[in-house]
Regions:
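Flexible helix-coil transition and linker loops at the boundaries of alpha-helical arrays
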Residues: 3-10, 43-56, 89-93
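Structural signature of alpha-solenoid helical repeat junctions
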Residues: 13, 51-58, 96, 116, ...
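Residue register of alpha-helical TPR repeats
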Residues: 16, 59-61, 99, 119
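Terminal, low-structured helical/coil segments at or just beyond the last alpha-helical repeat
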Residues: 114-160
Length: 160
């Protein structure tokens, strides 16, 4: 029996499973392996057969994960850059409606990095265009609180 090609198996894995695998590696502080897998995850977004909505999710979440790894290793500048790269996605049905993941942003706010988080939110508003009044008010409240030096309650956006 022939051993399956690891890269072929990886390419067939659903996005949510790859993300969950990297999350487990981060929780176990397997930084180098998590960084390697997150890099492969990001490359998956560049594949021509990758559908558009998944491409946006992959770009967003891979950069989020790479930023969390960088921050855990003490590289704040790289973490800030990864946050901004996460915001440069064209979006997806999920990101466009539920909004961006804010876990890395929260961690950077805890490190006193308000400006990069405000810039990230501006980038996210390009794809997060849902116009329901409660969401508009929530986004405005986040910006207000960040400008006041507070850390907003990002609620479910910490786990999307």
């Amino acid at each position: 029996m022939k051993t399956p090609d690891v890269n072929a198996v990886f390419d067939q894995m659903p996005t949510k499973d790859i993300r969950a695998t990297i999350e487990r590696m981060i929780a176990a502080e397997m930084w180098e392996k998590a960084q390697e897998v997150a890099g492969k995850f990001l490359k998956k977004a560049g594949k021509e057969d990758q559908n558009d909505f998944d491409r946006g999710n992959i770009i967003h979440h891979a950069h989020q994960l790479l930023g969390r790894i960088a921050l855990a290793q003490g590289n704040i500048e790289l973490a800030k850059n990864e946050l901004l790269e996460a915001g440069k996605t064209n979006g997806s049905p999920q990101l466009n409606s539920f909004g961006p993941n804010m876990l890395l942003a929260k961690k950077l706010l805890e490190a006193g990095e308000q400006e990069v988080v405000l810039a990230y939110l501006e980038l996210c508003y390009k794809f997060w265009t849902i116009s329901l009044q409660p969401l508009i008010e929530m986004r405005e409240q986040w910006v207000k609180e960040i400008k006041e030096g507070k850390i907003p309650d990002f609620g479910a956006n910490l786990i999307y």
